[in-house]
Regions:
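Intrinsic disorder/low-complexity signature
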Residues: 1-2, 296
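Acidic, low-complexity Ser/Thr/Gly/Pro-rich repeat segments typical of extracellular/periplasmic
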Residues: 23-302
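Bacterial N-terminal signal peptides that target proteins for export
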Residues: 2-12
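Bacterial N-terminal signal peptides
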Residues: 10-21
Length: 302
């Protein structure tokens, strides 16, 4: 087996936090709130929220009158700009929750007037509590795990696995419309597992590894998610018999290690000591998972 020297020192490990929200230029302007409201309102919905969220107001003290938890509140407590149809409900003795009839609009800032005077006798200047919040601007990022052999008895049969992560809740069918895969101009089948409304795992099936190097093209179009972004990614499919490193990642959680992806699967009992090294680092541990070799350092590096 060829010797692989990972040419980076421990200081190379840098934790890169990718915030999908950071891809957007959306900026929320938080409304200044009169500090005197702190005597009556202990918490409220603010900042950036999901489009599936409710809007809550938490009073500092229990409401002094009888509460009906089985029906929406009759009083018109909330006024939204832009308008949000829905109903207000008591959650407990000091928390009111507005439940929208539909999902909120993505990337929208809302201004709210809450009629505090409908719940208690209060001075004129504190009758209406004004605040605001914004919904997450929808976006998505794609992480490809790399090519792997779908049938260990036939290395010609390949698949490409990955995941598409949305910034906010997304409909599964709309997510599936964002990705198409092609090899030599032929569209390939993509299967999906929707972990939740945010993480969507995909597998591109039917890839063929040939005697000569080829490629697979992934085409992304965010139109179905109301995201104005389209792009392509091309992944090399090594020729049959061409054994090499195709991808390398640094994993930080829950345990820190280097994941090296090879063009062919490895034997689980493959001896790797002396074959894979990290400069100036000894006592490495290894584990083999199909095409991947996980390389663990003796100490966690910041």
């Amino acid at each position: 087996m060829k010797r692989y020297n990972l040419l980076f020192k421990a200081s190379f490990f840098v934790f890169l936090l990718l915030l999908i929200q950071g891809c957007s230029e959306q900026v929320q302007k938080k409304m200044r709130v009169n500090s005197e409201f702190a005597s009556y309102i202990g918490a409220y919905t603010s900042g950036m929220i999901s489009k599936e969220s409710t809007i809550q107001i938490q009073l500092t003290e229990d409401y002094g009158e009888e509460i009906n938890y089985e029906s929406p509140i009759e009083a018109n407590l909330f006024d939204f700009t832009p308008s949000i149809p829905g109903e207000a409900w008591w959650v407990n003795s000091n928390t009111i929750e507005f439940r929208p009839d539909e999902l909120l609009a993505s990337g929208q800032q809302y201004e709210v007037n809450f009629r505090l005077s409908a719940l208690m006798d209060i001075s004129d200047e504190l009758e209406v509590f004004a605040f605001n919040f914004s919904t997450v601007n929808q976006n998505f990022m794609v992480y490809a795990d790399g090519l792997s052999t779908s049938d260990f008895s036939d290395f010609k049969k390949q698949k490409l696995e990955g995941r598409l992560v949305t910034a906010d809740l997304a409909d599964s069918l709309n997510v599936e419309k964002t990705l198409k895969a092609y090899q030599n101009g032929k569209e390939l089948t993509v299967s999906w597992i929707h972990v939740d409304g945010l993480v969507h795992r995909f597998v591109v099936n039917g890839l063929l590894r040939k005697k000569k190097q080829s490629s697979v093209k992934l085409v992304y179009n965010g139109g179905a998610l109301d995201v104005d972004e389209s792009f392509e990614e091309v992944f090399e499919i090594p020729a049959l018999g061409d054994f090499k490193v195709t991808k390398m990642d640094i994993i930080h959680e829950p345990e820190q290690y280097v994941r090296i992806h090879f063009s062919d699967p490895l034997k689980t009992d493959q001896v790797l000591k002396g074959i894979i090294t990290i400069e100036d680092v000894s006592n490495l541990r290894f584990s083999v998972e199909g095409h991947n070799v996980n390389v663990y350092l003796p100490n966690r590096v910041a």
